[in-house]
């Protein structure tokens, strides 16, 4: 009998490691007390009493808007011009960078990552991710009929720049372009944030590798944490 779903779909259950680690942290808190455990496992901001932070400046402003304004379509499927301008200003902050850029509104960070994979990689090409990663990266690649190749994220307590370079060079030689995910800062699920020196090494390498083909790195979704 024919299967209803695609033949090449990944039938493995999705396991999001961050929630496994969250459960371990919660178990440790229950056993040892919250004063003895720092839970830095998930991308949420909590106050000193352990309560989820919901900023009044955000929600009060949103709630003050007329419901018709909130329900109205944007002027373009890529987002209102003022929204796109503010997103770019938020990304570059006060660096005064004048980058060639285009901003597109997506349904959340997941939509941004998924859209990038679909628009950058052809079917059968490879997405590069860290060996410890958010489980949905692989799912997004599978949906796009793409493969996944992982670099070892850590060398001891530091970012494994050697493994990252080796993996990127291998993929570049095979397909002529690189789409790599570095989830930083506050990497999901480890919470690791790369140092300025580590980022300088990555940037220098990517500038060098870009002589062989396009190089794209993404996912700063937790930069606000």
What are these regions (language model features)?
Residues 1-11:
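Generic N-terminal amphipathic, Lys/Arg-enriched alpha-helix
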Residues 3, 51-53, 188-194:
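Short, exposed beta-strand "edge-strand" segments with a Pro/Gly-rich flavor and a Y/T-containing core
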Residues 11-108:
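N-terminal small-domain helix-loop-helix segment of the aminotransferase-like
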Residues 42, 184, 218-220:
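A cross-domain feature marking catalytic cores of carbohydrate-active enzymes
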Residues 69-215:
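Conserved core of the PLP fold type I
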Residues 103, 220-221:
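Conserved Walker B
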Residues 223-225:
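Conserved small/polar residues in nucleotide/adenosyl-binding loops
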């Amino acid at each position: 009998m024919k299967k209803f779903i695609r033949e090449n779909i990944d039938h493995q259950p999705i396991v999001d490691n961050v929630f496994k680690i969250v459960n371990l942290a919660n178990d440790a808190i229950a056993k040892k007390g919250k004063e003895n455990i720092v839970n830095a496992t998930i991308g949420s901001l909590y106050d000193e009493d352990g309560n989820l932070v919901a900023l009044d400046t955000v929600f009060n402003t949103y709630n003050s808007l007329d419901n018709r304004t909130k329900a109205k379509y944007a002027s373009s499927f890529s987002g209102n011009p003022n929204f796109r301008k503010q997103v770019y200003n938020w990304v570059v902050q006060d660096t005064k960078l004048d980058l060639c850029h285009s901003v597109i509104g997506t349904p959340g960070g997941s939509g941004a990552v998924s859209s990038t994979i679909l628009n950058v990689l052809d079917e059968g090409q490879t997405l590069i991710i860290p060996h410890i990663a958010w489980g949905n990266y692989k799912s997004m690649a599978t949906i796009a009929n793409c493969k996944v190749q992982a670099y070892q994220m850590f060398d001891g307590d530091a970012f494994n720049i050697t493994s990252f370079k080796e993996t990127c060079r291998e993929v570049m030689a095979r397909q002529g372009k690189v789409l790599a995910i570095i989830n930083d800062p506050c990497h999901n699920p480890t919470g690791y944030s790369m140092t300025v020196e580590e980022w300088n090494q990555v940037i220098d390498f990517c500038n060098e590798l870009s002589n062989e083909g396009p190089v794209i790195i993404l996912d700063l979704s937790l930069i606000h944490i």
